[in-house]
Amino acid sequence: MESINWNTRSVREELAAVKRAAPFVYGLTNYVAANLSANVLLAVGAAPAIGAAADWPARFGAGAGALWINTAALMSSGADTLRTAARAASETGTRWVLDPVATGAGAPEYDAIVQELLAFRPSVIRGNASELIALAGGTAAGKGVDTTASSDSALAYIGDLARRSGAVVAVSGPIDYVTDGIDTLAIAGGDARLTRVTGAGCALGALIAALLAQRGAALAAAAAAHAIYAIAAERAADARGTGSFAVRFVDELSLLDPGE
């Protein structure tokens, strides 16, 4: 297993590519996370659009540089909307991220919709340990949208899920792990207050999509997104409280210089 961080050359190259290209990234996410997700994308130089207005799911799912679907978008959009966007991406080769929020938390109808989306072959699946263990067929009930399991305990499950789905799978925790079912990358660091900022994990899915839009290796893109998140959180760590930390975190994302 290899460890990477902000000082890894490939991580900085991934961010530099996004800043040069300013990719159009389309997302279906929940209204709780939409604002932070958009601001994270803007901070790294991407161009976001979020929501299911009219024919956006079909048109933008097919035409964006990349797509991310946070399944808590079901709060305000129907399952058919998520399927439409995922199908459009799958049929046109648009790379996309699946974030199966709260999977395994005790809502079987919701979980069934999440499982259906796997048929549209996401490029990356990201979530917390409880969500990914459940998606892989294990048992690790989350506490609502929060995890009750460690990222270490999810390692075997995410490897199996990656091999079965063909997706890169990324689990967040004190140490993040990203795997394609063969190779696994570990990313340490960050700040525990990210877990106290609404939508921070959801916005990570958006950042992964921005890096995926550059058409490089999905494993490298997903791992780089975690490393970028970690360094921004570390640099925001001297913020006084959770609210100022959230603002400072976006500031630090916007100030990251791949050439530093």
From Swiss-Prot:
Q: Name one GO molecular function term.
A: magnesium ion binding
Catalyses: 5-(2-hydroxyethyl)-4-methylthiazole + ATP = 4-methyl-5-(2-phosphooxyethyl)-thiazole + ADP + H(+)
Biological process (GO), any one: thiamine diphosphate biosynthetic process
Question: Sorted alphabetically, which keywords does the UniProt record give?
Answer: ATP-binding, Kinase, Magnesium, Metal-binding, Nucleotide-binding, Thiamine biosynthesis, Transferase
Q: Pathway involvement?
A: Cofactor biosynthesis; thiamine diphosphate biosynthesis; 4-methyl-5-(2-phosphoethyl)-thiazole from 5-(2-hydroxyethyl)-4-methylthiazole: step 1/1
Entry's InterPro entries?
A: Hyethyz_kinase, Ribokinase-like
What EC numbers are recorded for this enzyme?
Answer: 2.7.1.50
Which EC class is the enzyme in? transferase
Assigned protein family: Belongs to the Thz kinase family.
HAMAP family cross-referenced by the UniProt entry? Thz_kinase (MF_00228)
Protein name, as recorded: Hydroxyethylthiazole kinase
Species of the source: Burkholderia thailandensis (strain ATCC 700388 / DSM 13276 / CCUG 48851 / CIP 106301 / E264)
